[in-house]
From Swiss-Prot:
This is Histidinol dehydrogenase. InterPro entries: Ald_DH/histidinol_DH (IPR016161), Histidinol_DH_CS (IPR001692), Histidinol_DH_monofunct (IPR022695), Hstdl_DH (IPR012131). The lineage of its organism: Bacteria, Bacillati, Actinomycetota, Actinomycetes, Kitasatosporales. It catalyses: L-histidinol + 2 NAD(+) + H2O = L-histidine + 2 NADH + 3 H(+). Pathway: Amino-acid biosynthesis; L-histidine biosynthesis; L-histidine from 5-phospho-alpha-D-ribose 1-diphosphate: step 9/9.
Length: 441
């Protein structure tokens, strides 16, 4: 059901040579970019009318309005299953605890007497958040996007999720209920690239946003790339990934269940086990069969994901080699199921999120650990981070110098300006001192 890659025996290659040996999904955003271009431009030129036409084309429902009425949000919350409401409320509570601690404070550094630099953190004015609604419905993604934006102090928050024909063109009621729980009352029935374009350009119903965040399919990722430079984005999120670094102490039942848990997202989802134990590899492979047979989404998601080129059991000589492999892979989710798992986890450099030991499965992080589940995919964990309060903040440097403080460093500024052949830069200093360079004290 899942392939094997044997990296034992020979020394592991370095850098890209090692990455090329590891499984990865085919996820070509560049190819999708040309297909989303006309969609985005239609929204630009036709506004709400284009959104309504695309909802009919892609979602099979003709909308009267893309803006979700307040009554629909209230009704969705009122009709929400009490157990689901309690679970969402706990997820929100835990997420707030973690994200509130991420707030940044203004800090001033006195560089010299009379000269200081202050770093002030300012939230983005307006954000557009996206919650997918394709194969599955993700109210948890509403929580993971809204909470850090709110804790960052963003004043204007809008959310989009695809129109559902089953619900009269509204987004899924659980999505709407999650919005109501979080106090988000600006919600739109728009999906995929159309939602990103709506937030980027603005329409008659929706003011443009400064930033768009949230997971989605390849069309969402392509639209984000299309608008890079015009608006801020969190990341071009691809199919979900789990990597498990495990040794002989790991429970194969746990490992198999965790691999399956992420494979059920998408046929392109990646499930990777890295281990130095052939016995564990055999046991996990054997355990996959009955667990897969006992769950849902077998033929359309789980089996294609596990059998795909993006999933594998990778055999290594030891935990040290396993660490090199998982760092080269840069998984969205990385579980450490080894002896002394915390110490091993401390050595990891590249991962979207790390889950330590047998009692911290990825599913916990998906819903209620308090961490954020909007994470870098496709190996981007080597340079990117998951969604956080920081994602919605901008650091502004405030420079405050007295005349004496400027005079003390003026000759250095002029020297560097002349070295770069930018004499007007130096002149801006000289102009303040009678067109002379003051002597430093």
């Amino acid at each position: 059901m899942i392939s094997r890659i044997d990296l034992r025996g020979d020394a592991l290659p370095e850098g890209s040579a090692l990455r090329d040996l590891l499984p990865r999904a085919d996820f070509d955003v560049s190819a999708a970019l040309e297909k989303v271009r006309p969609i985005c431009e239609a929204v630009h030129h036709r506004g709400d009318a284009a959104l309504i036409d695309f909802a009919e084309k892609f979602d099979g429902v003709r909308l009267e309005s893309v803006r979700v009425p307040a009554r629909a949000l209230a009704d969705a919350l009122e009709q929400l299953d009490p157990a689901v409401r309690a679970a969402l409320e706990e997820s929100i509570r835990r997420a707030r605890l973690v994200h509130r601690e991420q707030r940044r404070t203004t800090h001033t550094t006195q560089v010299v007497p009379g000269g200081s630099v202050t770093e002030k953190w300012v939230p983005v004015d307006r954000v557009g958040l996206y919650a997918p609604g394709g194969r599955s419905v993700y109210p948890s993604s509403v929580v993971m996007n809204v909470v850090p934006a709110q804790e960052a102090g963003v004043e204007s928050i809008a959310l989009a999720s695809p129109a559902q024909a089953e619900f009269g063109g509204l987004p899924h009621p659980t999505i709407l209920a999650a919005c109501a729980l979080l106090g988000v009352d600006e919600v739109y029935a728009a999906g995929g690239a159309t939602a990103v374009a709506m937030f980027a350009y603005g329409t008659e119903s929706c003011a443009p946003a400064d930033m768009v965040t949230g997971p989605g399919n390849i069309w969402v990722a392509a639209a984000k790339r299309y608008f890079t430079g015009k608006i801020g984005i969190d990341a071009e999120a691809g199919p979900t990934e789990i990597a498990v670094l495990a040794d002989s102490t790991a429970d194969p039942v746990h490992v198999a269940s965790d691999l399956i848990s992420q494979a059920e997202h998408d046929p392109l989802a990646a499930a990777v086990l890295v281990t130095d134990s052939v016995e564990l590899a055999d046991a996990v492979e054997k355990e996959l069969e009955p667990q897969v047979a006992a769950t849902k989404h077998i033929d359309d998601r789980i089996v294609p994901a596990l059998k795909g080129r993006q999933s594998a059991i990778v055999l290594v000589d030891g935990v040290d080699e396993g660490l090199r492999v998982v760092d080269a892979y840069g998984a969205e989710h990385l579980e450490i199921q080894t002896a002394d798992a915390a110490a091993v986890a401390d050595r990891v450099r590249n991962a979207g999120a790390i889950f330590i030991g047998p009692w911290a499965p990825v599913s916990l992080g998906d819903y209620a650990a308090g961490s954020n589940h909007v994470l870098p995919t496709g190996g981007c964990a080597c340079h990117s981070s998951g969604l956080s309060v920081q994602s919605f903040l901008r650091g502004i440097h405030i420079v405050d110098y007295t005349k004496d403080a400027l005079a003390d460093v003026a000759h250095h500024v002029v020297t560097l300006a002349e070295a770069e052949d930018l004499p007007a830069h130096g002149a801006a200093i000289k102009a303040r001192f009678g067109w002379k360079v003051p002597e430093s004290k």
